[in-house]
């Protein structure tokens, strides 16, 4: 008699794990326990909870799981397009990924999307929050993506955030249209884009305390500076320009034919540096050193008068004691101060003229600190960041009389 193999319906039998209390002395309904374990309905915790929004505005599950059988063997079955009315009246188009389970054949898509629920405009609200985050200070795109994942439970690709935040700047950014005062500060800051040295040019309104225009250029030459200042002040009042002591700025101001104030702070800083180096090299100490610094103080007082006329008279009196002036100061006075004395005292006859360039340097310190000067790789990237910083600074520091 031949033996026949009969199917035991293995596919219908599940494994169960007996627990210690199954062997207690108490009377237990074993059939009920086994039936309950075999017919247990699977509970898939954290199933399809984490959403991901890619650079194509497509919502996907981070780790799709079949909601019926719990299988991870999922294939993609195309996308469906949806439109959402935004808070600004415009329509945002996005897609939702569709899936199918390879094990049980169940088809499913994105459900309970917290960003596009009924009568909600969360997608647009998220897009509107990105500028606010960028205004705070430098944040990497991946870090911003992490913020959304932590607080909203959705992971947005860094490329999507870049697409939302980029403003497609060519080479300059300009502030809003205010009634500018005509009293400006100008300065430059070096930075590196993809390892190459560039310069950040800034024209700053001294009265409103806000930047007017900024530009990124490859070379620091008079042509670029002059072109930038003229284009930034076109159809705007232009009374005076305050800069530091860099020689190129004097030539540009003369070509533009505008009143030019040199920074008093940088002048005093230069004098102090020359004295310090001179005394150290020549090992000068004691009374001789005190005499040199006292004489330098007399020179500084010439720039602290009540008017240009008084400043000129004070400077003439100082020069009458020329033989008493230390050698280190004589050389600097002869080559620099005598030729440009009028540029240091313009502010004495006009209270609106800034005597230092400290305001624009403070703006630099707060909007692009040293630690991030080498991070950016493109002009558009750094200009987008600076545009948000300009908006933030203007909101906080503008002074309108």
UniProtKB/Swiss-Prot annotation:
Keywords: Transposable element. The ORFIS open reading frame represents 87% of the sequence of ISM1, a mobile insertion element. This is Insertion element ISM1 uncharacterized 48.3 kDa protein. This polypeptide is involved in transposition, and should therefore bind to nucleic acids.
């Amino acid at each position: 008699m031949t033996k026949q193999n009969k199917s035991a319906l293995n596919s219908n039998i599940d494994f169960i794990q007996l627990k210690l209390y199954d062997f207690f002395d108490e009377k237990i309904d074993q059939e009920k326990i086994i039936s309950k374990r075999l017919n247990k309905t699977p509970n898939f915790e954290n199933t399809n909870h984490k959403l991901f929004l890619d650079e194509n505005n497509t919502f996907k599950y981070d780790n799709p799981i079949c909601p019926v059988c719990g299988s991870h063997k999922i294939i993609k079955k195309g996308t469906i397009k949806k439109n959402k009315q935004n808070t600004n009246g415009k329509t945002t188009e996005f897609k939702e990924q569709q899936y199918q389970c390879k094990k049980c054949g169940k088809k499913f898509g994105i459900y309970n999307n917290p960003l596009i629920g009924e009568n909600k405009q969360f997608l647009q609200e998220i897009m509107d929050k990105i500028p606010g985050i960028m205004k705070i200070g430098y944040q990497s795109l991946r870090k911003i993506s992490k913020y959304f994942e932590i607080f909203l439970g959705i992971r947005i690709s860094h490329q999507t955030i870049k697409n939302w935040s980029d403003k497609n700047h060519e080479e300059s950014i300009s502030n809003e249209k205010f009634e500018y005062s005509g009293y400006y500060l100008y300065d430059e800051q070096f930075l590196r884009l993809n390892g190459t040295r560039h310069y950040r040019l800034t024209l700053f309104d001294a009265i409103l305390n806000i930047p007017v225009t900024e530009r990124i250029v490859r070379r620091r030459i008079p042509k670029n500076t002059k072109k930038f200042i003229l284009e930034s002040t076109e159809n705007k009042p232009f009374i005076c320009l305050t800069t530091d002591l860099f020689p190129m700025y004097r030539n540009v101001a003369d070509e533009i034919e505008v009143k030019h104030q040199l920074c008093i702070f940088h002048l005093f800083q230069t004098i102090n540096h020359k004295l310090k180096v001179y005394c150290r090299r020549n090992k000068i100490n004691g009374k001789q050193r005190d005499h040199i610094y006292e004489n330098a103080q007399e020179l500084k007082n010439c720039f602290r008068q009540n008017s240009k006329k008084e400043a000129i008279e004070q400077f003439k009196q100082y020069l009458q004691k020329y033989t008493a002036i230390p050698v280190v100061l004589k050389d600097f006075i002869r080559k620099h101060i005598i030729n440009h004395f009028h540029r240091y005292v313009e502010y004495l006859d006009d209270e609106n003229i800034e005597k230092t360039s400290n305001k624009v340097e403070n703006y630099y310190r707060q909007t692009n600190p040293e630690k991030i000067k080498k991070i950016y790789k493109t002009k558009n990237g750094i200009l987008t960041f600076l545009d948000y910083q300009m908006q933030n600074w203007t909101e906080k520091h503008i002074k309108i009389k």
